[in-house]
Design a protein with these regions (language model features):
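Long, charged amphipathic helices and adjacent flexible linkers at domain junctions
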Residues: 32-69
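N-terminal active-site wall of soluble small-molecule enzyme domains
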Residues: 61-74, 81-82, 86-93
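Flexible, glycine/charged-enriched surface loops at secondary-structure junctions
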Residues: 16-17, 22, 41-51, 79
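Nucleotide-binding motor/catalytic cores of P-loop/tubulin-like NTPases across gene-expression machines
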Residues: 90-92, 98-130
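Glycine-rich phosphate-binding active-site loops on the catalytic face of alpha/beta enzymes
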Residues: 2-25
């Protein structure tokens, strides 16, 4: 199940309730980590242009901006991308492209920080008073 979730490019995996309360939860998490690490080695992450017909014009602009930034980072061999987001929407658009670069998402909102923490390839940071 873990391997298939990685192959389907899930943003996150987690233990089921039975496993989370069982006697071997630490071992289960370690096994999930190992399976995920191995499975990710066989994936190729590109920048597919996902469906944009159901989003606003402003969000389309954000999506295109993120796509351009990811392609530019790839062309220039840039390892880290910084983005600033109040709602997490920009980070969600970035995660949808399954980036191969580390994306640091800065926010002043604790709920946004928690939300972006489970997104694929996003490393969230809290900026108090922003």
């Amino acid at each position: 199940d873990v391997f298939n979730a990685v192959m389907q490019k899930a943003d996150t995996t987690m233990l089921s309730e039975e496993t989370a309360i069982g006697s071997y939860k630490l071992e289960a998490v370690e096994a999930m980590r190992d399976i995920t690490t191995e499975a990710e080695l066989s994936l190729e992450y590109g920048h597919p242009d996902y469906e944009s017909s159901n989003i606003s014009e402003r969000d389309k602009e954000k999506k295109y901006l993120i796509r351009s930034a990811l392609r530019l980072a790839e062309d220039l061999d840039i390892e880290h991308i910084l983005l600033f987001t109040k709602t997490g929407r920009l980070a969600r658009f970035a995660a949808a492209y399954r980036p191969s670069h580390m994306i640091h998402a800065f926010t002043g909102n604790i709920q946004t920080l928690r939300y972006t923490n489970i997104l694929f390839g996003i490393n969230p940071h809290l900026l108090p008073n922003w």
